[in-house]
Structure formats: C-alpha cells, structure tokens
C-alpha cells in the first residue's frame, strides 16, 4: 500500500469524510484490520480564506505547496488536496512536489464519463462555479459541459458554504434552497450535478437530489484508494 498525503482543513468539516472514506475503502478492499497508510496536514482555513477574499492566490499557493512538500518529505507517495476551490493553485503544488498529485476534477471527470454523461450542473464556491480552473479542465480533458446557477443564486450558494457549511451549520432551509437550484439546472438540461464543494454532500443527501449526484469528496477519496493500492 502506498502512503497518501492529505492536505486538509479547508474546511476541517469536509476533511473528516476524506479520512473516513479512504479508511473504509482500504478496509473493504483488503479486509481484516487493514486501514489506510496516510499523513494529514490540516491548515488554518482562516489564513487561506483571507487569501481567497483578497485575491492573493499566489500566497495561498505558496502555503499549500509548502505544506504538500512537507507531506512528501514525511513519506507521502501521492498528494490529495481535500478541497475543490483550492485546486485553483494546483499547479503550485505540482511544481513543488515530485510525487503524483491526484486532481479532484480529473477524478470527477472520469466518474461522469463512466456514467455516460456530458452535460452536468455544477454547484460550489463562486470561485469554482465562475472561474476556469475547474470548468475549463472538465471541458478540455473530458469534453464535459457544465451548467452553473444564475448570478444571484451563485452568490447565495457561496454565502451558505462559508457562513454555514464551513462552520458546521446544516439547516433544512438551506438544503431546500440547494434542491430548488438543482431542479432549475435539471430543467436546463443538466444530466447530473457535481457537488463541487466538499461540504455540500454534508448538507444535501444524494437520495434527495432530483439529478444523479457526483459527490466530489466520495469520488476523490475513492480515487485515492485506487492510487494507494495500485
């Protein structure tokens, strides 16, 4: 089994499922008392969010690249960045580290193609929904088109993520709102929906969604398990 390095804390609420899912995946594959060989560097999200708000992505990339290098030096044979949004600075990490970087959009793209879909809705932070680092990669690497909510909805979705989900607040009103947005995107031709923020799956159960769900946390964790056992 390879040792995986998890770069988490953004938020820590969604890093917990990564740890659980990877361990469950290893146990399911190997049985007995087997568990995941992994390292975790959990950053202070306050510092990262300040970089996001100020548009200082270079500084954010430097912080995460240094943390990833520390994981590599500690024995990690691959790096998993446990957040969608911060894949905006994935190149900084890939440049600094010599070990494989398991990109969340690549894992998600493969999962979408495996289901025979090419046009999917995308929910996430405003950075993930509006900027090209995620949607562009899905289009360029997999020819997947993404539908995003209207501007007003994007603002509210982002606000719920940072003011509620990242703080461990999960309420029914916000859940219902997300489901309404998914409904609207289904009417626009969405074949599935990407939960493109690792906290969304904590709020919206897959079985309640009007569209098939691509939960990036679960997909990314499964990709990590495959890498570890390859």
Stretches found by the model and what they are:
Residues 1-230:
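Non-catalytic structural scaffold of enzyme domains
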């Amino acid at each position: 089994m390879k040792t995986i390095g998890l770069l988490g804390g953004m938020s820590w609420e969604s890093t917990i499922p990564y740890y659980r899912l990877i361990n469950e995946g290893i146990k399911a594959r190997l049985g007995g008392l087997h568990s995941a060989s992994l390292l975790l560097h959990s950053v202070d999200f306050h510092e990262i969010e300040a970089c996001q708000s100020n548009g200082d992505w270079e500084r954010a990339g430097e912080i995460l690249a240094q943390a990833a290098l520390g994981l590599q030096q500690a024995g990690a044979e691959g790096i998993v960045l446990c957040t969608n949004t911060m894949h905006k600075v994935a190149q900084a990490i890939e440049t600094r580290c010599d070990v494989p970087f398991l990109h969340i959009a690549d894992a998600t793209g493969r999962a979408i193609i495996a289901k025979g879909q090419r046009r999917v809705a995308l929910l996430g932070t405003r950075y993930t929904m509006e900027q090209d680092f995620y949607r562009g990669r899905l289009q360029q690497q997999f020819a997947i088109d993404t539908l995003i909510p209207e501007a007003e909805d994007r603002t509210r979705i982002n606000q719920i993520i940072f003011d509620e989900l990242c703080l461990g607040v999960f309420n029914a009103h916000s859940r219902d709102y997300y489901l309404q947005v998914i409904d609207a995107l289904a009417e626009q031709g969405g074949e599935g929906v990407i939960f493109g923020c690792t906290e969304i799956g904590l709020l919206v159960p897959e079985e309640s969604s009007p569209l098939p769900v691509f939960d990036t946390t679960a997909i990314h964790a499964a990709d990590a398990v495959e890498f570890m056992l390859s």
